[in-house]
Amino acid sequence: DIAIDIGDMSGGQDVPDDEEGREVVRQFSVLERHRREDVYSICGNHDRSGLSEPPAWWWQKWVDPMGMYTVHSGVDASRRPYSTTGTWERYSFTVGNVLFLLMSDINEPSQTVGRGTLGGNPAGVVTGETFSWWRDQVEIHPDHIVVSAHHYVLKNTTVASGDWEGVKRDADGHWQSHYHGYKPQGAPIGASYLYFVDSRPDSGAFEQYLESHPGSIDLWLGGHTHTHPDNTHGGK
């Protein structure tokens, strides 16, 4: 068996630190039926490091999907049941005829405020390079079952994934936090879906590709929104 960790191993609003990283490793260490390497991870918005820090240094050091920081994370890449190809930001592995394409959330490069300054900062982000990699992997594996994963879902696909659906208005008509924090600088139009692609806001890059190539992937795994499984806010 394997598991996909969709992100947010850090549980706070502040940027994560080494103390929290050691706790993540401790919790993984008490798995009873699986090895740490049976869990394949991607970075969530709460796992991001600060804008002035090296990209996702905390998550790379302590969660370490590529097994590059074994002395800290305890992850030994040679013990993966299915070997990975790529980088911490985007990587793949294959189980039989099933191709997994895993993409991590990052800080938006064009922003001067974000994780740390704005806490969780709930708009999802990938680079143009990550989108191109995903598209290329999909197109060169037409006979595979393709499972894509990112911390965020795509726009208008499930609960609270539409514009302004992650927040709500108070009695005076002002926006306030609901499913996610209200972050007008970091998450315009209340976006709590995969919003920035190649630094383009509300890009629709993945959605447009999938609409014009129906059936090109079989499943999109995401998380981010904290709610119950029977919640259909926004009609989804």
Model-found features: residue ranges?
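Intrinsic disorder/low-complexity detector
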Residues: G7, S49, P109, D172-H174, ...
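N-terminal active-site segment of His-dependent metallophosphoesterases
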Residues: D1-E19
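Extended active-site neighborhood of metal-dependent phosphoesterases/phosphodiesterases
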Residues: D14-R135, I140, A205, S216, ...
